[in-house]
A protein has these predicted regions:
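Metal-dependent phosphoester-hydrolase catalytic domains
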Residues: 1-3, 14-35, 187-195, 203-275
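Alpha-helical scaffolding within the catalytic cores
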Residues: 27-34, 58-60, 138-140, 147-151
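Extracellular/periplasmic catalytic domains that process cell-envelope and extracellular macromolecules
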Residues: 37-40, 66-67, 92-93, 117-120, ...
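Active-site beta-strand/loop signature of hydrolases that rely on acidic residues for catalysis
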Residues: 41-50, 61-89, 127, 153, ...
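Active-site surface patch of divalent metal-dependent phosphodiester/phosphate bond hydrolases
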Residues: 42, 51-138, 214-219
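Active-site-proximal beta-strand/loop segments in catalytic clefts of secreted hydrolases
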Residues: 47-51, 75-78, 101-107, 127-131, ...
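Soluble or luminal CAZymes and related metallo-dependent hydrolases
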Residues: 56-60, 78, 82, 119, ...
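A well-ordered secondary-structure block
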Residues: 114-162, 166, 252-254
């Protein structure tokens, strides 16, 4: 009889210690799926306009990123709360751990929710497997129809520090505004011998407003050039190339453009050579 009582007490203690999970528990205590990626692909960088507002689950966005496991991810049209959820899903569901830096250009309740008196942050973000330093967040003097800007961080790619930029230029028929934005961005990029410039430039390769960028850097796709002879796969659902991985002082090894059901912009990633 004492043995039975002791066993019962031990069982109750175990239940009390393990429990059923308190409200607010996240996935961090759950086993990762058997097919979890668990590690990033070194020297792979990605850019993706998330599409906002779009009715897309952040778990699906995270799964798309995890499928290619880039070392550095730049996202545009991003709400800070969504990026945080994406980062959590990447770690808890896919075993990929990222640092995150934000480049907020505005606070917009319609785009990012929040409270009327404290709307959510909207803009760009960079996720990096390696730590990031020296973050800057710059709003262009003229955003056009909506505030726009660029952010930049320093992180390690190929074993060396590299400046990484993430930007989103003005949309539609605002060529003059984009030209001014390109001038601001190019002046900063020119300060670095090695730089990766990612983003949605809202301009096709031969658009005059991109001339300053082409003078400083090359596309990760060697066939893509700012001339009629260039061959540049589209990166949007409307069959235009608006998204770029510009490289300065870094050679590309491979690149891919990947349509996705979760945005009107395709995923674009590049594998980089020695930095």
């Amino acid at each position: 009889m004492p043995l039975l009582v002791g066993a019962a007490i031990l069982a109750l203690v175990c239940v009390a210690l393990v429990g059923r999970g308190a409200p607010g528990d996240d996935l961090s205590g759950r086993a990762l799926p058997a097919d979890a990626v668990r590690d990033v692909v070194p020297n792979r960088v990605m850019t993706w306009n998330l599409c906002n507002p779009c009715d897309t689950d952040d778990a699906d966005r995270a799964a798309q990123i995890a499928a290619y496991a880039p070392q550095v991810v730049a996202v545009q049209e991003a709400c800070a709360r969504d990026v945080e959820k994406i980062r959590n899903h990447l770690e808890n569901r896919h075993g990929l751990v990222y640092h995150v830096a934000y480049g907020t250009v505005l606070r917009n309740w319609g785009r990012c929710g929040g409270k009327p008196w404290s709307p959510g942050a909207y803009g760009q973000a960079v996720l990096s497997a390696a730590p990031m330093t020296d973050r800057v967040d710059v709003e262009y003097p003229d955003g056009g129809s909506e505030d726009r800007g660029y952010m930049a961080v320093t992180t390690t790619v190929g074993g060396r520090p590299v400046r990484v930029f993430n930007t989103h230029f003005a949309e539609r028929r605002q060529e003059a505004v984009r030209a001014e934005q390109a001038a601001v961005l190019a002046a900063e990029v020119a300060r670095y011998d090695r730089a990766i410039v990612l983003g949605d430039f809202n301009a096709v390769p031969d658009a005059p407003e991109l001339g300053r960028m082409w003078a400083l850097a090359a596309d990760a796709d060697p066939r893509c050039r700012p001339s009629s002879a260039g061959t540049c796969p589209p990166t949007t659902d409307w069959h235009s190339k608006f998204d770029y991985v510009f490289l300065r002082g870094i050679a590309p090894l491979a690149h891919r453009v990947l349509p996705t059901p979760y945005s009107d912009h395709h995923l674009l990633h590049a594998d980089l050579g020695p930095v």
